[in-house]
Amino acid sequence: MIRNKTLIFALLVLSACGKHTREDEPQQKVYQNSQQSLFDPYIAQGSIFTREVKNMPLATNSAAIAAYMPKMPAEYLPERFKSWLVTSLNTTNYNIPVYVVNSHDPQQKYANFTSTDKRVTHKEDLVKYTIGRIPLPSYAVPAGGGDKSFAVYDRATGMMREYFHAVKDEKGTWHFSASGYFSAKPNFKDLGKDNFAMQLTTGSSAVVGMLNPLSQIGIEEARKGEIRHALSFTIANAGKGFSYPAKQGDGTSTNPNAPLEGQWFRIDPK
């Protein structure tokens, strides 16, 4: 079971215009910008991550859900975790680092990826797109903590790969337990239009089966003090089932006020 239980919640979303690369611009332009931020401009502009929250339907038990959530850690966390494991901002542990690569760049480094997990090997397209020789910088490391996740987004091809519990052996080969992918246009052009729900085609590096890395806070956003898209966060458990735009869930709670994975929340800006 993938351990990372993720919900999506929405902040008050404002519209922002982003500069898009033209199709007729030379490939060298992509080389030069392979490390350009995914968040400035935000590549998921126009997706569900930037929709307005004011017109979303409100759950009839919204207040009860909000009141129940702070009680969930005491119910589900092991005793040794209760005093310190809280919802928080994480920069090195339990997040999903994203490595932006360019497979058309002759200087791009590569690594071998393999898996024996049935969640991968029983899916023909996951074998095709997430196993084998994958562009990845030599300095890449997964997030700290038990999930050991990271994502690899290729600007040249638009291929967006995500990995769960990735461990590198002494020969430099990455062994992973689960993976997911979405094939976007080169340079992620029109991503919000082509994949409004921000869902992976197959698989996942988190339970919900979405492009969760794009619901994190980018460095440029932190510097500006301004976030114009939905964010995701992790909780101790969730209700059984899931809610759009999540593709799946692994919550076990039968409490009617337990939030579902994929459910949206709004933080009062006051």
Go through the PLM ranges and name each one.
Residues 3-9:
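Sec-dependent signal peptide recognition
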